[in-house]
């Protein structure tokens, strides 16, 4: 191809020189007469230069076949040039110059078009993404009235509420899943089954637990309460103040009541045989824990007062009374569950009117087969005393058990509202630093 380019250049030069000498050679004459010998010379020169073959080798008769091959190739190029001359009568020099100019002009055109397309893309991006109106809504949504302020307020409130609900529902997730993926069309049964599956607890086959660790925690809590009661007599003083404030509400035949004994025990309750099961009549929509509790201790409360005979005049006769009531044994099956306000019905009007019915509650109750043993001591009289009268003991025991059954025995239960588990600033505390532990360098 380089040789053809040189040939084209020579042809153009030949034409120009011919014009300068006012001698015109047609393209047909050049192709038929001059071009074959010229091409043969070019091929032979290239072979001699590339392979270092002497000139005498090309003139020998042994290479007649090679010369014939070269002549055939020259004839091919001659026919090609004839076709070009018949079609356009144009020279190779003008063709190459036009191709070079065309390639340069196509590069400039592509560069300009590329820059222009980039500018158009930037303009569309700035217009539709940067300066777009974010407050525009769909045409199907109702537009607020410009004449009514209340309409504008209600519309903005609805828009904000819809935006906030959609926003929070889209970002709230549980374990990588959205809120709608986990809660839509899923009842309490599915949620409980999911919980049991994730904690590897089978209600039907899981054995009962001993709760030894729980007994240790409860024992530490009770021991702390007892130490505070022993170091400070705040419980006794508080109860005496309470009874004194209620003296005006006491019957007229009772004198002031004073506390003579308060025994908070020295033993601890034992919790055992804990098992999780479905609540009865809940259709497997609620779980509860059954725990057996056993307390073998002495919890005593003693008082003294006087019976007054106010007829025919006040304090005609006075009869001293001393009572001591002690619980020495308590056994029961404790039922504990978590619930909300929608799962139970209040038993009194005061409970029904309470405003704290939202949130979750810890519900507990005792089975009807509970056992509560008492040790009741009574002493009536000043000189001739009546001690431990069975009738008094039975009456006191009956009223205590009645009070307990009406509040804590199934189907009645007690609910304790659970506090919020989210961290709050008002519940934050720091450990108090003792001044004796401060280094001397900081103290100075």
Swiss-Prot record:
Membrane topology: Single-pass type I membrane protein
Tagged with keyword Cytoplasm: no
Assigned keywords, A-Z: Endoplasmic reticulum, Lipid transport, Lipid-binding, Membrane, Transmembrane, Transmembrane helix, Transport
Identification of the protein by name: Maintenance of mitochondrial morphology protein 1
Domain characteristics, as noted in the entry: The SMP-LTD domain is a barrel-like domain that can bind various types of glycerophospholipids in its interior and mediate their transfer between two adjacent bilayers.
First-listed, main subcellular location of the protein, grouped into a coarse class: endoplasmic reticulum
Protein's gene: MMM1
Taxonomy, superkingdom: Eukaryota
An example molecular function term from Gene Ontology annotations: lipid transfer activity
All ranges on the Cytoplasmic side of the membrane: 132-444
Transmembrane residue ranges: 111-131
Lumenal topological segments: 1-110
Pfam families per the UniProt record, alphabetical: MMM1 (PF10296)
Assembly and oligomerization: Homodimer. Component of the ER-mitochondria encounter structure (ERMES) or MDM complex, composed of MMM1, MDM10, MDM12 and MDM34. A MMM1 homodimer associates with one molecule of MDM12 on each side in a pairwise head-to-tail manner, and the SMP-LTD domains of MMM1 and MDM12 generate a continuous hydrophobic tunnel for phospholipid trafficking.
Lineage, top ranks: Eukaryota, Fungi, Dikarya, Ascomycota, Saccharomycotina
InterPro entries, alphabetized: Mmm1, MMM1_dom, SMP_LBD
Subcellular location: Endoplasmic reticulum membrane
């Amino acid at each position: 191809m380089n040789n053809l380019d040189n040939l084209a250049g020579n042809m153009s030069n030949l034409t120009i020189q011919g014009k300068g000498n006012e001698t015109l050679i047609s393209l047909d004459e050049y192709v038929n007469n001059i071009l074959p010998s010229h091409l043969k010379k070019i091929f032979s020169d290239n072979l001699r230069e590339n392979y270092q073959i002497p000139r005498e080798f090309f003139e020998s008769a042994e290479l007649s076949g090679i010369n014939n091959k070269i002549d055939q190739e020259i004839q091919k190029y001659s026919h090609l040039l004839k076709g070009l001359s018949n079609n356009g009568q144009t020279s190779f020099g003008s063709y190459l110059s036009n191709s070079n100019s065309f390639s340069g002009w196509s590069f400039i055109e592509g560069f300009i078009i590329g820059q222009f397309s980039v500018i158009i893309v930037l303009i569309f991006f700035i217009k539709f993404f940067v300066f777009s109106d974010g407050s525009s809504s769909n045409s199907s949504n109702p537009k607020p009235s410009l004449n009514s302020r209340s309409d504008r307020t209600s519309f903005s409130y609805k828009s904000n509420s819809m935006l906030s609900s959609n926003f929070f529902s889209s970002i709230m997730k549980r374990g990588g899943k959205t809120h709608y993926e986990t809660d839509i069309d899923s009842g309490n049964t599915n949620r409980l089954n999911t919980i049991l599956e994730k904690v590897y607890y089978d209600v039907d086959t899981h054995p009962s637990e001993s709760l030894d660790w729980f007994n240790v925690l409860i024992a530490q809590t009770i021991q702390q309460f007892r130490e505070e009661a022993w170091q400070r007599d705040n419980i006794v003083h508080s109860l005496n103040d309470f009874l004194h404030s209620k003296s005006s509400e006491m019957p007229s035949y009772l004198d002031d009541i004073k506390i003579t004994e308060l025994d908070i025990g020295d033993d601890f309750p034992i919790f055992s045989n804990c098992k999780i099961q479905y609540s009865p009549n809940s259709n497997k929509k609620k779980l509860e824990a059954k725990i057996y509790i056993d307390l073998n201790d002495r919890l005593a409360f003693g008082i003294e007062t006087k019976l007054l005979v106010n007829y025919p005049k006040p304090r005609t006769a006075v009869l001293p009374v001393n009572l001591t009531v002690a619980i020495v044994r308590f056994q029961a099956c404790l039922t504990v569950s978590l619930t909300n306000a929608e799962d139970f019905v209040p038993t009194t009007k005061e409970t029904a009117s309470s405003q704290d019915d939202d949130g979750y509650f810890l519900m507990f109750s005792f089975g009807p087969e509970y056992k509560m043993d008492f040790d009741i001591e009574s002493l009536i009289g000043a000189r001739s005393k009546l001690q431990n009268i069975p009738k008094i003991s039975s009456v006191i025991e009956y009223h205590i058990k009645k009070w307990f059954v009406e509040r804590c025995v199934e189907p009645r239960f007690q609910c304790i509202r659970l506090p919020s588990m989210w961290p709050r600033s008002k519940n934050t505390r720091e450990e108090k630093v003792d001044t004796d532990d401060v280094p001397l360098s900081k103290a100075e």
